[in-house]
Regions:
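Phosphate/pyrophosphate-binding loops at sites that engage ATP/ADP/AMP, CoA/4′-phosphopantetheine
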Residues: 104-117
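Active-site-adjacent loop and "lid" segments of alpha/beta metabolic enzymes
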Residues: 1-26, 31-35, 41-42, 46-107, ...
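Short strand-loop junctions, especially beta-strand C-caps/beta-turns
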Residues: 123-125
Length: 214
């Protein structure tokens, strides 16, 4: 179930403040609430990751614009407690998700959020079947053609285990394979558990690109 605004503030704000005393690294906060994000910006956060794509709180978009913040707009069907229990049927998952993200990005622009501060995420595992997830990752280039950075959250997710049969903590190799494919298709940001291993993958991929056919 969703936690209250008060509990969310108690959990998140002290952590942001603590990190800010040690590092200037950009910080992302997962929230759907404008009040939480307002406090997060004040504490030093730079990015709002909203799984509702600015649909849950009508004041969040204008707040982000006012604070000159960035936003991740994610696609999902249903709510986190039930979305994988009652899976929706898509006519064409790729075009439907892309159209939705395009519409939400236009909404964000209308709120006043700068184009370069809008990021899209096709929402792997959020109301999708295993096949849906693979279709979306395979079509990553179709999403980057919208002109916004694409964030992908693939790490250790069940679509990998469905193929490899491995438990979440054993899905590193599958995660790296999916990550490499998405990045080659144009994904700009990856959310991971295994940062060091992913960094090595990206360094080698970057080096290989220097010698590719142009």
């Amino acid at each position: 179930s969703y936690i209250s605004e008060e509990e969310e503030l108690e959990r998140v704000i002290p952590l942001i403040e603590a990190v800010r005393t040690r590092s200037a690294v950009p910080l992302s906060v997962d929230t759907r609430k404008a009040a939480v994000m307002k406090a997060a910006f004040k504490a030093g956060a730079t990015l709002c990751n909203d799984i509702s794509a600015l649909t849950d709180d009508p004041t969040l978009g204008t707040l982000i614009a006012k604070e000159d913040g960035a936003v991740v707009l994610m696609h999902k069907r249903g709510t986190p407690p039930t979305m994988q229990q009652e899976l929706p049927q898509y006519g064409n998952v790729v075009t439907e998700v892309r159209d939705y993200l395009e519409q939400r990005a236009l909404y964000a622009l209308n709120c006043g959020i700068a184009h370069e501060r809008i990021i899209i995420d096709y929402g792997i595992g959020f109301g999708k079947t295993v096949e849906d997830n693979y279709r979306l990752i395979a079509a990553s280039a179709y999403f980057t053609s919208l002109g916004y950075p694409l964030l992908v959250g693939l790490s250790r997710k069940s679509f990998i285990g469905a193929v490899t049969g491995q438990a979440p903590e054993q899905r590193l190799t599958g995660t790296l394979a999916a990550t490499m494919y998405a990045v080659q298709q144009g994904a700009s940001i990856v959310r991971v558990h295994d940062a060091a291993e992913t960094r090595e993958l990206l360094l080698v991929l970057k080096e290989l690109r220097k010698y590719g056919i142009h």
